[in-house]
A protein has these predicted regions:
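Membrane-helix exit/interface motif
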Residues: 43-47, 74-77, 81, 99-101
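Short alpha-helical hairpin
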Residues: 1-23, 37-42, 93-96
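Conserved small/polar residues in nucleotide/adenosyl-binding loops
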Residues: 126-128
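Conserved alpha-helical segments that form or flank metal/cofactor-binding pockets of metalloenzymes
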Residues: 57-90
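Acidic/His metal-coordination segments adjacent to aromatic residues that form catalytic metal sites
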Residues: 14-30, 91-116
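Long, hydrophobic/aromatic N-terminal blocks
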Residues: 21-64
Length: 128
């Protein structure tokens, strides 16, 4: 893992994850599609929830980019002969959100930090 991800995440993704991912390509792709969709909906939700914070300028392009990624992953799923379907969300994001503040303004800050951690973790996996 590049040093910049280690500084942000404070831990490396286990090497065993790669082997498990290779053995579970269908579920990995479906989960990836769901993560892209969730990133887009979270961006839109934040724009809606905090209209006074001027988030639309930054988050609207992000939502479009994440939806583009969602569509790209859907094409890969179809190409591989898999079928997109609903799956149970993983515990990683849920655990982070459960530990976050429910009171403003900390709720917004925690949400943005959690989104950044999830994105950083996914980017760190590229460098296994």
């Amino acid at each position: 893992m590049p040093n910049k991800w280690k500084k942000i995440l404070h831990s490396q993704t286990p090497k065993e994850w790669l082997q498990k991912a290779l053995e579970s390509q269908e579920i990995l792709l479906i989960d990836h599609a769901h993560c892209e969709k969730k990133a887009a909906t979270t961006a839109i939700s934040l724009i809606h929830r905090y209209p006074d914070k001027n988030l639309a300028k930054k988050l609207s392009p992000l939502a479009r980019e994440e939806l583009l990624h969602f569509e790209q992953v859907l094409r890969v799923i179809k190409k591989e002969g898999y079928k997109y379907r609903n799956i149970r969300p993983g515990a990683y994001a849920k655990t982070l959100y459960e530990a976050s503040s429910k009171q403003e303004p900390q709720r917004l800050k925690d949400t943005l930090i959690i989104c950044a951690l999830i994105e950083a973790r996914s980017l760190s996996l590229i460098h296994i």
